[in-house]
A protein has these predicted regions:
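Anion-coordinating catalytic cores for phosphoryl-, nucleotidyl-, and glycosidic chemistry
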Residues: 2-61, 205-828, 834-904, 908-909, ...
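Basic/charged alpha-beta structural segments of nucleotide/phosphate-handling enzymes
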Residues: 38-159, 174, 325-351
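Short, charged, surface-exposed secondary-structure boundary motifs
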Residues: 66-72, 197-201, 290-297, 468
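Conserved helicase NTPase motor core
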Residues: 120-206, 226-229, 233, 453-454, ...
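Structured, non-catalytic alpha/beta "coupling" segments that mediate domain-domain communication
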Residues: 101-119, 188, 604, 632, ...
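ASCE RecA-like P-loop NTPase motor cores
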Residues: 1-34, 43, 51-52, 68-74, ...
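Conserved protein kinase catalytic core
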Residues: 67, 173-174, 465, 783
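Serine-centered coil/turn micro-motif
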Residues: 99, 126-129, 194-198, 292, ...
């Protein structure tokens, strides 16, 4: 009678296999062939070494018994896309037939049907609902296409080997069971009697396999590790591995395994971290070939084409090929976002950048916008090699796409690019050799049957391990039961997760570490630990579980003996306040930086680190060049000072400017939009009475498109229509009693109120028949909530009163009645704010106090941050990164400093609310 052995892989099942092999060899001779069928090639390698004393053992996997030509997975997805598109337009799946995920779902469901040996006819006979009938018809189309192209699996009939052992399987689909039945194993070793393995055990019992009583071994007591997130969890796992090696002489890295449920969550993070720490590693799944520099080169070239030569893509590709940092500055200055036409029209000067871009155009011309897969592959590889690509595995991976012409042709360049990404991501290169001295890293499925001295299991949180278990969206479990008992039930995945957890915890010979990230790195919200941990630890609830775990803080300061790298070594040493010489050895800036931070945060008084100039040389330069008595200043600059003195210091004294990315603009910048409105209105009024608004708009739009940054084309077209309508509305609402007489009137060095000498440009000056004048300042932005008629708004609304005074100087023979902010756009709410001459006379003392305060603070070098929480000027400030995230707390500590008393006093009510 065939023998069935039950038990855990280690130590029972593996020991039973060793005994069975020895018995077989003793009975049939040392050279008698013995076949052993296992789930993975890695397990075959492990058992080969374990059974090294025996000769003529032939390990095989199910992949060694092909059932016919295998269609490429990406080809099946293309076939699924085609079938999805051909579903009835009025059928059950009509609402989702164009969705991206339907093709993948169809192929997954059809694969389950095939593995259950279910023919299209059998499916159609059990299809009792419109949904099932539609799905059965699609399955018939799928199988028909595969049959016509010789891809449909055919039952293989291999000759049974003289002797075969089946080792390590706990689940087999119908097709696999049929194969095993034909191979007629004489002994089967099943690693579990858990519920998930019961269907296999029942099937083996029907074949007269007699099970042995499983031997139970006590599980290795686990250590628990709770880390704040995946990056910290990975580092702690590595730290645990190195600590184990330190404490266990004679152990090697390959005696340790770091395992996880799915590759998506940890694979890249572990690769990057272990590479950074220079730790030898064997990644069971290998490394994606997409990480090779030549693969990156190929994908960057495709991204350049996909984005129509966007500035970002072109510069990234250029940077990959060499150092061209000056190209970044040049393209910003030219306002290049992308597009072949924009490169050609704006990049006039000969030079290496223009040569490079023209070369890209020539290479890109070798790839059509659409075509057969083979043509696209040929064109891409030719361009790639021209750019320096050489790595043969990259070329071979791309060449496999040529076979997809059978499934769908032609395809667009966008589809081709997508599939290039996929084939390079899924093609893997070996990373280290198994048990060759490197740390073993794998997903749990790939490590089945292996054992290690230390096993560290990562990601034990809900939705990771156990993975989310969901029914097939196309074929529910209830429908699967109706169709065939051979179809797998998706909700049985819960049992598989329990089984996998049992297997992985049993794979630790000496020490088991169970780890989970307790915080979501994106939201910092707590995560729920896996319910699998409760059974493994005996904890009654998650609160008790956390008490059992080693709790890694968010920012740990560690003992130096546990440091993984210099930074972790230096931090605890710095906590001990070492000498300046030690700090200097770490970094020449460290001592000064720590001293500045301590001085800034330990004092309630303002310091030189808060915007107070105290150095005599700095003050001398300030008095020489930047005090108001030496400047001809704009009203906007003065408003900036009262917005925040530190902002004024950065913008107008240090001249610090943000380095904007042209492509970051979704639409035209607010400053450019304002200038465009100004130019259009100036042209219109200057050409009166024969002005053609339509022609003026067209000319200005064309001029800006040639030189400025318009953002996305569709949004720009919408913005142009808005400009047309808002300009037309403004002109229709014009008061005929006021006639424009001056446009964009420049003035400079006008002493309007000592010590302020003003410069600026008045958008428009209107006159009435009685020789009264008014000043208009166009506003195209959003209306500021704190603006009020005849109000300085704490110094943040000085333009109207100062322009009113300037107009009086410019037109001494006329009466300047008022100055107005004219918000004439939808964003501005069509509001008008005015400042009258009468109000200005009444507030003359207040204006002088404001200007005097600014002059005195600048003279004293007081440029402290003004950062109240309410109505904060920090929200959209370009210099927020300089101030840091703690600026509001710092302001609360220091706003009572005497240096800011007068400033807060003239700011008025708003400052009082936040002081």
């Amino acid at each position: 009678m065939p023998k069935l052995v039950l038990g855990t892989f280690q130590p029972h099942l593996e020991s039973a296999l060793v005994t069975a092999v020895a018995d077989y060899k003793k009975q049939h001779g040392p050279l008698a062939p013995l076949h052993i069928l296992v789930p993975t090639r890695l397990l075959a390698l492990h058992l080969t070494r374990r059974l090294a004393p025996h000769a003529n053992l032939r390990f095989q996997t199910l992949a060694d018994f092909p059932t016919g030509p295998m269609p490429p997975p990406l080809g099946l997805e293309l076939l699924g896309r085609q079938i999805a598109r051909d579903l009835p337009a009025d059928g059950y799946f009509a609402p989702i037939r164009e969705t991206a995920g339907l093709a993948t779902a169809l192929v997954t469901t059809f694969t389950d049907l095939q593995e259950a040996n279910l023919t299209p006819t059998q499916f159609q006979q059990t299809a009792t609902t419109p949904k099932l009938r539609e799905l059965a018809a699609a399955y018939a189309t799928y199988c028909g296409w595969l049959t016509a192209h010789d891809y449909l699996p055919t039952p293989a009939a291999p000759a049974p080997p003289p002797a075969l052992f089946l080792y390590g399987f706990y689940d087999l689909n119908t097709a696999q069971r049929n194969l095993i039945a034909r191979l007629a194993p004489t002994a089967v070793f099943v690693p579990s009697s858990a519920p998930y393995a019961q269907p296999l055990l029942d099937w083996l019992h029907s074949l007269d396999f007699s099970p042995t009583t499983p031997t139970l071994h006590p599980a290795t007591p686990p250590s628990l590790l709770s880390s704040p997130g995946e990056p910290a969890e990975v580092r702690e796992a590595i730290r645990s591995a190195l600590t184990w090696l330190r404490d266990h002489p004679g152990q090697r890295l390959h005696d340790i395994a770091i395992l996880y449920r799915t590759r998506d969550q940890y694979d890249a993070l572990l690769r990057d971290t272990l590479r950074h720490l220079n730790i030898p590693t064997h990644f069971r799944s290998g490394r994606p070939i997409s990480e090779h520099p030549d693969a990156r080169l190929l994908l960057l070239f495709l991204e350049t084409l996909r984005t129509d030569y966007s500035r970002a893509a072109v510069l990234e590709l250029a940077g990959y090929l060499g150092s061209h940092t000056h190209w970044d500055r040049l393209t910003r200055e030219l306002g290049i976002i992308g597009g072949r036409q924009q490169w050609q029209t704006r990049l006039h000067q000969p030079g290496d950048l223009r040569d490079f871009v023209h070369r890209l155009f020539q290479l890109g011309d070798g790839l059509p916008a659409a075509g057969p897969w083979n043509n696209l592959v040929t064109g891409l590889l030719a361009a790639w090699r021209e750019l320096g690509g050489q790595h043969a595995p990259v070329a071979r991976a791309i060449e496999t796409l040529a076979a997809l012409d059978t499934f769908e042709s032609p395809v667009t360049l966008a589809t081709f690019t997508d599939y290039c990404h996929r084939v390079l991501d899924t093609t893997r290169e070996p990373a280290g050799r198994f048990q060759d001295g490197g740390l073993f890293v794998s997903d749990i499925m790939g490590a089945r049957g292996l054992s290690f001295s230390l096993v560290i299991v990562l990601g034990l949180v809900e939705k990771s391990f156990p993975r989310p278990i969901r029914e097939d969206p196309l074929l529910l479990d209830s429908e699967r039961r109706q169709i065939s008992p051979n179809l797998p039930l998706k909700l049985r995945g819960h049992d598989e997760e329990k089984l996998l957890f049992e297997l992985v915890t049993a794979s630790a010979r000496d020490q088991l570490v169970l780890s989970w990230p307790r915080l979501d790195p994106a939201t910092a919200r707590p995560r729920v630990p896996s319910w699998l941990l409760l059974g493994a630890t005996g904890a009654n609830d998650f609160e008790s579980l956390e008490k059992l775990a080693t709790h890694i803080p968010l920012s740990p300061i560690r003992n130096t003996t546990l440091a993984l790298e210099e930074r972790e070594f230096d931090l605890p040493v710095l906590e001990q306040n070492p000498s300046d010489a030690y700090r200097q050895a770490i970094s020449p800036f460290l001592s000064a930086g720590l001293a500045a931070a301590q001085a800034r945060w330990q004092n309630h008084a303002l310091t030189r680190h808060d915007g107070l100039l105290q150095d005599p040389a700095a003050l001398a330069l300030l008095h020489e060049r930047f005090v108001l008595e030496k400047l001809v200043i704009s009203a906007t600059s003065l408003e900036n000072f009262f917005r925040c003195p530190f902002y004024y210091f950065q913008k107008h004294i240090l001249k610090t400017e943000p380095w904007d990315e042209p492509e970051a603009a979704l639409t035209i910048a607010a400053s450019d939009l304002g200038s465009l409105y100004h130019h259009i209105l100036e042209d219109y009024y200057r050409q009166q009475p024969a002005a053609d608004l339509h022609a003026i708009l067209a000319a200005r739009f064309q001029e800006f498109e040639a030189t400025g940054v318009t953002g996305f084309a569709a949004i720009w077209e919408l913005q142009k229509q808005i400009i047309r309508e808002e300009i037309a509305t403004l002109l229709q609402r014009a008061d005929p009693a006021w006639q424009p007489i001056e446009f964009e009137r420049d003035f400079t060095d006008l002493t309007v109120s000592a010590p302020v000498r003003l410069r600026g440009k008045i958008d428009r000056i209107d006159r009435r028949d009685d020789n009264r004048l008014r000043v208009l300042d166009y506003k195209t932005g959003k209306f500021k909530a704190n603006l009020r008629d005849n109000d300085f708004c704490g110094g943040e609304a000085l333009q109207l009163p100062l322009y009113l005074l300037a107009a009086e100087k410019l037109f001494p023979d006329a009466t300047v009645e008022s100055a107005h902010y004219l918000y004439f756009t939808l964003r501005g709410g069509y509001r008008t704010i005015r400042f009258t001459q009468t109000a200005l006379l009444e507030k003359d003392a207040e204006l002088n106090r404001l200007l005097g305060t600014a002059a005195a603070m600048i003279r004293a070098g007081t440029f402290a941050q003004y950062a109240p929480v309410k109505h904060s000027p920090c929200t959209h400030c370009d210099y927020r990164p300089i101030c840091g995230n703690g600026i509001h707390k710092l302001y609360e500590r220091k706003c009572g400093d005497p240096a800011m008393t007068e400033f807060l006093a003239v700011k008025g009510a708003d400052a009082e609310e936040t002081a």
